[in-house]
């Protein structure tokens, strides 16, 4: 979702932690729109509609130029599973409190504050917020509709909002399986035009 417009579709996701992600994107009527492959070594987005592929390093700059969203590789992997950036080595605990049956934990960082809200019943992360040094929100993320999947609580709904960029991403899962072998690879069609970034 952006000020320019929003779009929706469906996807099949294969995620192999800690290093690879394959997303098959479908548009209206199930039309195969494209394929996104992320690994620690490579970023590849294949546009099925015009037979082009964008290839680059999986760094924040490449990802930002493609999706106009400032997220690093690990942040994207964690977002698909409803995890968010854990406290870093230099972060210090700012405060702990309980509000509306949620544990609110704040950490001070070099660049501002990280806020975690944890459900008091399930101990699952309900929301996460990054604030800059002036206290303005850089990123807000929420999870909901927790489901027990093979003994692990997983969110079926994830929403990430980038207030400064006026952009948001919403992920809603219909079906999930975990801890099963997956293959995160993709071969480009022979005649695809490849653009390197």
Where do the model's predicted regions map?
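Beta-strand-dominated lipid-handling architectures at cellular/organellar boundaries
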Residues: 6-12
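An acidic-aromatic
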Residues: 20-74
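Short, surface-exposed charged micro-motifs
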Residues: 12-14, 33-35, 115-117, 145
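C-terminal low-complexity, charged extensions that often adopt amphipathic alpha-helices
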Residues: 58, 66-95
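Short, solvent-exposed loop/edge-beta patches enriched in aromatic
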Residues: 5, 16-19
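Gly/Pro-enriched, hydrophobic low-complexity segments
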Residues: 93-196
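A short, Trp-centered hydrophobic/proline-enriched beta-strand micro-motif
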Residues: 1-3
């Amino acid at each position: 979702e952006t000020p320019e417009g929003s779009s929706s579709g469906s996807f099949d996701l294969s995620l192999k932690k800690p290093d690879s992600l394959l997303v098959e994107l479908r548009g209206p009527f199930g039309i195969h729109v494209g394929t996104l492959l992320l690994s620690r070594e490579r970023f590849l987005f294949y546009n099925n509609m015009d037979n082009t592929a964008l290839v680059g390093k999986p760094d924040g700059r490449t990802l930002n130029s493609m999706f106009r969203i400032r997220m690093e590789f690990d942040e994207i992997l964690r977002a698909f599973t409803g995890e968010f950036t854990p406290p870093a080595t230099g972060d210090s605990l700012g405060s702990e409190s309980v509000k509306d049956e949620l544990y609110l934990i704040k950490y001070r960082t070099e660049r501002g504050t990280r806020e975690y809200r944890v459900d008091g019943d399930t101990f699952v992360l309900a929301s996460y917020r990054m604030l800059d040094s002036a206290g303005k929100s850089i990123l807000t993320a929420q999870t909901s509709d927790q489901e027990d999947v093979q003994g692990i609580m997983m969110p079926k709904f994830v929403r990430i909002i980038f207030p400064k960029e006026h952009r948001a991403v919403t992920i809603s899962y219909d079906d999930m399986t975990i801890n099963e072998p997956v293959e995160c690879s993709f071969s480009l069609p022979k005649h695809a035009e490849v653009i390197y970034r």
